[in-house]
């Protein structure tokens, strides 16, 4: 999923987790016992889509195209041979899974499946691996220094990143419940983008009132049974990381770019005011 790397996430990671050496690169297996009842492979959701639930988009991000080749089977994934991670077209790892020059320690290339439906298929979005996240930070200008980030820190950062996205989707589903009648199949995610320094009007108003600015912002575009809807997500520092890898306070709401979104915001504001 998103490759946005926020400085607060790296600096506040202090949770007690299994050592990163216990979470090594694993390759996909040909038959996962947990998923054999649905499909051969590990793990892919193969339920047919409902043709009445909106149109699909054909624009698939490059890092999602072959993502399921790197989703680890929870039971048998660790037993697979590393050679299965190679791209059969050139017998090389995909570029975004390649260790960076002078990288101080190895990182896992295993990717975790999210609970977020992809609008272009019957599959779910897949989160980046530790190696992909490291490479993304380097592309954004970050440089590793001694004792800056450890192997264990990268393990924790990925868990925090994934948990943030799962929580954001849960908040979106709460808003989308207002439209359950018109879209009974539920929403799916089309695309998303980071806008860390493009503060939303709501965030700026809060700042003028004395509150801190968010350390990150994402815009998520969802498919509501054929209608594109944009959500704004502001990320605020919530303090110490807990055992569930949560430290971020999320402010999730539909963007005020349609009459439907304005009406939703007004209804929810009224309910909160009168409850």
UniProtKB/Swiss-Prot annotation:
Q: Which organism is it from?
A: Bos taurus
Q: Where is the lipid attached (N-myristoyl glycine)?
A: 2
Tell me which InterPro entries the record gives: Holocyt_c/c1_synthase
Q: What is its EC number?
A: 4.4.1.17
Q: Where is the composition biased (Polar residues)?
A: 9-28, 48-59
What is the stated purpose of this protein? Lyase that catalyzes the covalent linking of the heme group to the cytochrome C apoprotein to produce the mature functional cytochrome.
HRM repeat extents: 31-36, 41-46
Protein name, entry field: Holocytochrome c-type synthase
Catalytic activity annotation: holo-[cytochrome c] = apo-[cytochrome c] + heme b
Region of interest (Disordered), ranges? 1-59, 83-102
Record's compositionally biased regions (Pro residues)? 91-102
Q: How does it sit in the membrane?
A: Lipid-anchor
Alphabetical UniProt keywords: Heme, Iron, Lipoprotein, Lyase, Membrane, Metal-binding, Mitochondrion, Mitochondrion inner membrane, Myristate, Repeat
- Extract the Pfam families matched here: Cyto_heme_lyase
GO MF terms on file? holocytochrome-c synthase activity; metal ion binding
User: Which positions make up the signal peptide?
Assistant: none
Q: Which PROSITE patterns match?
A: CYTO_HEME_LYASE_1, CYTO_HEME_LYASE_2
Q: Where in the cell is it found?
A: Mitochondrion inner membrane; Membrane
Give the CC-aspect GO terms. mitochondrial inner membrane; mitochondrion
Q: What family does this belong to?
A: Belongs to the cytochrome c-type heme lyase family.
Main subcellular location: mitochondrion
Per its UniProt entry, what is the enzyme's top EC class, as one word? Answer: lyase
The gene name reads HCCS
């Amino acid at each position: 999923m998103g490759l946005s790397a926020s400085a607060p996430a790296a600096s506040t990671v202090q949770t007690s987790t299994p050592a990163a050496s216990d979470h090594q690169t694993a390759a996909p297996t040909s038959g996962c016992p947990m998923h054999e009842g649905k499909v051969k492979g590990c793990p892919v959701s193969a339920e047919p889509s409902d043709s009445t639930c909106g149109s699909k988009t054909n624009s698939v991000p490059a890092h999602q195209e072959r993502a399921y080749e790197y989703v680890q089977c929870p039971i048998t994934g660790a037993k697979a041979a590393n050679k299965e991670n190679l791209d059969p077209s050139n017998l090389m790892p995909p570029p975004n899974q390649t260790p960076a020059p002078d990288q101080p320690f190895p990182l896992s290339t295993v990717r975790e499946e999210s609970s977020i439906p992809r609008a272009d298929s019957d599959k779910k979005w897949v989160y980046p691996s530790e190696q992909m996240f490291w490479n993304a930070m380097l592309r954004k200008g970050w440089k590793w220094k001694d004792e800056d980030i450890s192997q264990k820190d990268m393990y924790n950062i990925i868990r925090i990143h994934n948990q943030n996205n799962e929580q954001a989707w849960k908040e979106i589903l709460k808003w989308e419940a207002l439209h359950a009648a018109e879209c009974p199949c539920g929403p799916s995610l089309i695309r998303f983008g980071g806008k860390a320094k493009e503060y939303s009007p709501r965030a700026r108003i809060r700042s003028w009132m004395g509150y801190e600015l968010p350390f990150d912002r994402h815009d998520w575009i969802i498919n509501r049974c054929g209608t594109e809807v944009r959500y704004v997500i502001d990320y605020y520092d919530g303090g110490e990381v807990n055992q569930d890898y949560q430290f971020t306070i999320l402010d999730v709401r539909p963007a005020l770019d349609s009459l439907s979104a304005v009406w939703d915001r007004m209804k929810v504001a009224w309910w909160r005011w009168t409850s």
